Structure formats: C-alpha cells, structure tokens
Regions:
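Catalytic phosphate/metal-binding cores of nucleic-acid and nucleotide-processing enzymes, i.e., regions
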Residues: 1-113
Length: 113
C-alpha cells in the first residue's frame, strides 16, 4: 500500500501549511512578520485564542521542499497581501498539478499578483 504524504501543519497560531498527495506544499501565513494586514500588529498571535487577518502571504514548495517561483516580485517566492479567494485559487492549482512548471505558469496568471 502506498504511504500517503498529505498532511496539515500549523505555525504559531498565525498560519498553516498543506502538503498534497502530488508532493507539492503551500504555506499560508498571516502574522506580524508576514506580508499581510497584521504585519505591524503589536500583539503576539500565540497569546490569543483567535487570530484573523483580511490578507495573507503564501509560499509554495516543490517535492524537495524548495521554494517555487509564484509571482513576479523581487524574490519571486513569497506572495503577500492576498485575499482569501486568491489563496483558495492557489491551493486548487497546487493540489491539482503534477509538474512544477505548471504551478509557476498558472500562478502568474492570477490577478492579485
């Protein structure tokens, strides 16, 4: 029986990651050090029961845990200030794609980048 590699992860009450059966992963973060609406917040998300933000940043990783270029920004690997709808669109792309170049190409077409 093939071992499943899909999993969820959490990060300091300010984000999560998802690794999909295809081996690709996405990190979604909305904390004080991330490119999001709460970037300059003085509160520590770990001390609060709930932590919300109107925007988030994402990064996508390949099967070797290396960052994939997903935008035209300066570093190209982290994309910030994204709405929930845009994050959901990227999750669909990452979870349903078989090759890295397809993720790179499709993510560049999203309007919020």
């Amino acid at each position: 029986m093939k071992e499943k590699i899909s999993q969820f992860g959490t990060n300091r009450n300010k984000g999560f990651s998802m690794t999909f059966e295809n081996g690709f992963a996405i990190s979604v973060q909305w904390g004080t050090e991330n490119y999001c609406a709460r970037r300059f917040e003085k509160k520590d998300p770990r001390e609060l029961r709930f932590w919300r933000s109107s925007t988030a940043e994402i990064a996508v990783l390949n099967k070797k845990d290396e960052f994939i270029k997903i935008n035209n920004g300066s570093d190209g690997v982290v994309s910030g200030w994204l709405s929930t709808d845009t994050v959901a669109e990227v999750i669909v792309i990452v979870s349903s794609t078989k090759i890295q170049k397809e993720i790179e190409k499709k993510s560049l077409t999203l309007s919020s980048y």
